[in-house]
Amino acid sequence: MVVMPKYKISHMLKLKLSLFTLFILANSFGQKIEKVFLDKDDAAKNCYTIIYPDKLPFKGYVFIIPGFGETAETVLEETNLPKLMAQNGLLTIIPTFQDGVLSFGVDSLSQQSFNTILKDVTSKHQLIDQRFFVGGFSIGGSCAIKYAENSIIKPAAVFAIDPPLDFERFYNSSNRDIRLSVNTEPNQENVYMIERIEKEMNGTPKSALANYYKISPYSFSDAKQTAIKNLIKMPLRIYSEPDINWWLKERGADFTSMNVTDCSAMINELNRLGNNDAVLITTQNKGYRKPDNFRHPHSWSIVDNNELIEWLLKQK
């Protein structure tokens, strides 16, 4: 599952709302928050929000990648994680890539855009010798893991919050959901994602399986374990709240549609390959979305923010 955008805002209105929101957040938290645009004429993409620690020197820097459809402002409303990271001495960056909030995360365009923003941040703030961390929510977590697999500048540690990892599984489960929706309207997220996955993979799993192996951060059916072998020495945490009864009741979904299927399989294979620093953390009844605090296990809130930060700061 991924988070889908509910609406679109014009570029100028989005810029005004973003700056206003950041102003409110900066005053509420007493932290300096800056919005940086790589393209001054486009406020919807190729930009990043940066939250500064109160004092120097930094203890490192961290990229927190939003879920599908999320702006930096949405992230700051949903979770205190960026604020707490900055309070603990980490220069904190929330990027928006070339495709804007509709970034697919694991595709080459998103990964190239990530590298462009990373280079801009590291050069402006002289961070070459600093510890670097990366993580994200949903497809933002997929993006973080994909980056760690292929990057030249390796992060000291990676975290991901309920990310979809195996897009062959995602594609097949979405197709199955539509097939089972005989007397009900199909989930529009699945309808969209089937088309989007086919576009990004240049085909279906039957016609372009090699592309699914190449682009997915993890592939259950790839016996060669191509992608994850690059993570054998990488400290990695994946969070998930596998509330199967909620998914059955609220979404008519089962384990084949849940991201924890990918997450648990990937962690298991990494452990068997010798990575004892790869851990799956499961939670119960922690998933709630702000501002209305409604129940949803696929949420930022499943993470114990302070404990995650403590773990990151222990990494070398």
Give a label for each model feature.
Residues T74-I93:
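Short amphipathic alpha-helix adjacent to the substrate-entry channel of hydrolases
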Residues G105-H125:
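Alpha/beta-hydrolase active-site loop
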Residues G136-K146:
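Glycine-rich nucleophile elbow surrounding the catalytic serine of serine-hydrolase chemistry
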Residues F104, L236-L248, S257-K316:
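C-terminal catalytic histidine-bearing segment of alpha/beta-hydrolase fold enzymes
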Residues Q126-S138:
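Alpha/beta-hydrolase fold nucleophile elbow
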Residues F58-F68:
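Short beta-strand element of the alpha/beta-hydrolase
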